[in-house]
Amino acid sequence: MSRRDGSGGRASAGRTGKPDQKGKLLDMSATPPLLEIKDLHVSAEDGAILRGVDLIVGAGEVHALMGPNGAGKSTLAGALLGHPAYTVTQGSISLNGEDVTAWATDVRAKAGLFLAFQYPEAIEGVSVTQFLRQAMAARKGTEVSVLEVRVLMTEWMERLGMDSSFASRHLNQGFSGGEKKRNEILQMALLEPLVAVLDETDSGLDIDALRVVGRGVAAVRAERPALGVLAITHYERLLTELVPDVVHVLVSGRVVASGGPEVAAQIESSGYEAWR
């Protein structure tokens, strides 16, 4: 049975303790959630899109957000990072206890909010290595050596099944859909965010590429067990790899239900009719 609590009741219980990779409990009871969205209303040029979204992601939790086309999923992702196309008209977004609703996009990113784009932009003339070095320096607030970047890139590219030549290619220039998504996961690994928002990362991937991405996310979480993940998707297939703690259903700009993986299975079998 799914919950009608958009904050994800199972998730709040999970913050009292979650085992790390050595079996020790992470003490999460005294800390604020990593990501807290309260009564979020968002508009664009065409009018209101989100109409009161409530959602909480705690440390070490994986949340999935599913919904039909036009529900507002990608709008939520854009609003979380402060995309100028969207205006927050009511409500708030908090990152690790700090209200970031009015913060600029780059400030949110430096604070630890990461978005894996549905359609990453190509940047001609800037190599993947150059981009990641600049991004890591911005995130850490200090210079990062080329050697440090290359060592980390080599390790993670092997984990993600990426060819070594990838490092010198121009960012997303001529990349296949799968290469773009692998690059997004590579960025997530090196930038070490507090919260990673995956905006339809499974879009355009075949089953093998999907498995690599899913396992790549799992590998990042194994290295950093406190990482919070919000995966936005149309399909249950990504969730077989990510295994979410909570699945939320977004319809007409509102979270209308939250529950466990059984919610995704229900959507896969019968669609969104139960919540329309």
What kind of feature is each model-predicted range?
Residues 35-37, 49-52:
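Conserved structural motif at the start of ABC-family nucleotide-binding domains
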Residues 44, 53, 57-59:
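Conserved hydrophobic segment flanking the Walker A/P-loop of ABC-type ATPase nucleotide-binding domains
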Residues 66-68:
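The feature captures the beta-strand-to-loop junction immediately N-terminal to the Walker
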Residues 92-108, 172:
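ABC ATPase NBD Q-loop/coupling interface
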Residues 115, 119, 125-140, 152:
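Q-loop/switch helix immediately C-terminal to the Walker
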Residues 188-189:
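ABC ATPase C-loop
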Residues 197-201, 208:
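Walker B catalytic motif
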Residues 246, 250, 254-276:
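Conserved beta-strand-loop-alpha-helix hinge in the C-terminal portion
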